[in-house]
């Protein structure tokens, strides 16, 4: 038989072929990567629970194992696969022995009619990793962009990403967004991501629409996003910048209790009850402003 185990009892990749006939204990004839008798092969690498590519190339006189893009090694054999006979059974996730079933997932199984070279194994691995990275690459909803975009420079498995833009005056290759002026039309541009891994590349395009300023809407959104605690017993941190780059200033209705900066000046004595204060935020953006009041209670002293 030929047997592939992503992780044996020692957590190592195992890929072996029986090199002779021993009906009572065929496992003692295993040759290859992590065989039962270590003298008949080489130790496989420790593997993990992440997705990985396991490749075995069997020729008339050798078995070679690969883990992702790394060649583990080659072990000479004398038994040919054709000697296994006909009417053979093949299992995925099940052993020929009375072992427990495989607990994991299998994404894809490929069988070739020829022996792959190391170059081919690496090429397949890199292209598969890049395809998965491309499929998973997202920059969010691009139908009505109002803010700078986060464009990743690196992805999992060592994939690097570079970006190009069709119109840098609207969105730069770093994701900096310049919105059209209020009353103008939206701008639609293309961002192109080039994903690279060890000399292999794929590209993915994103169509991005940048909408013009609408100061009333934008300030309303910025104000809606602004939130404060309703009851406080210690100083609060007041943001000075809001959504879309709006600036925020603050004004307290009673600075003898709570300052404009959010610092508690005095708390009521225990038993006097909480002191109510209104803290008003003024959000400003491109010459327009909107106010948002917050009713806050400064807690009385505990004792």
Regions found by a protein language model. Give the residues of each.
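Extracellular glycan-interaction surfaces
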Residues: 2-11, 15-79
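Residues on the solvent-exposed faces and adjacent turns
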Residues: 5, 58, 113, 165, ...
């Amino acid at each position: 038989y030929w047997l592939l185990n992503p992780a044996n009892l020692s957590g190592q990749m195992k890929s072996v072929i029986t090199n002779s006939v021993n009906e009572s204990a065929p496992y003692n004839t295993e040759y290859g990567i992590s065989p039962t008798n270590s003298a008949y092969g080489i130790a496989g690498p420790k593997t993990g629970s992440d997705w990985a590519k396991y490749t075995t190339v069997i020729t008339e006189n050798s078995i070679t194992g690969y883990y992702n893009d790394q060649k583990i090694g080659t072990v000479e054999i004398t038994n040919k696969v054709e000697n296994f006979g006909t009417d053979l059974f093949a299992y995925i996730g099940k052993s020929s022995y009375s072992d427990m079933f495989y607990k994991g997932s299998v994404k894809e199984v490929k069988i070739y009619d020829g022996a792959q070279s190391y170059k081919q194994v690496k090429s397949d691995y890199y292209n598969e990793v890049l395809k998965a990275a491309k499929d998973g690459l997202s920059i969010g909803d691009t139908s009505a962009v109002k803010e700078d975009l986060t464009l990743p420079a690196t992805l999992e498995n060592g994939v690097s990403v570079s970006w190009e833009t069709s119109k840098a005056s609207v969105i730069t290759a770093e994701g900096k967004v310049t919105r059209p002026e209020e009353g103008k039309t939206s701008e639609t541009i293309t961002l192109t991501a080039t994903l690279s891994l060890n000399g292999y590349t794929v590209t993915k395009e994103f169509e991005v629409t940048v909408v013009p300023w609408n100061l009333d809407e934008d300030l309303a959104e910025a104000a809606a996003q602004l939130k404060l605690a309703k009851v406080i017993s210690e100083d609060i941190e007041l943001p000075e910048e809001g959504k879309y780059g709006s600036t925020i200033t603050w004004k307290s209705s009673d600075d003898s209790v709570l300052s404009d900066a959010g610092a508690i000046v005095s708390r009521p004595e225990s038993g006097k009850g909480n002191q109510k204060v209104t803290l008003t935020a003024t959000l400003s953006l491109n010459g327009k402003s909107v106010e948002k009041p917050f009713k806050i209670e400064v807690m009385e002293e505990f004792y």
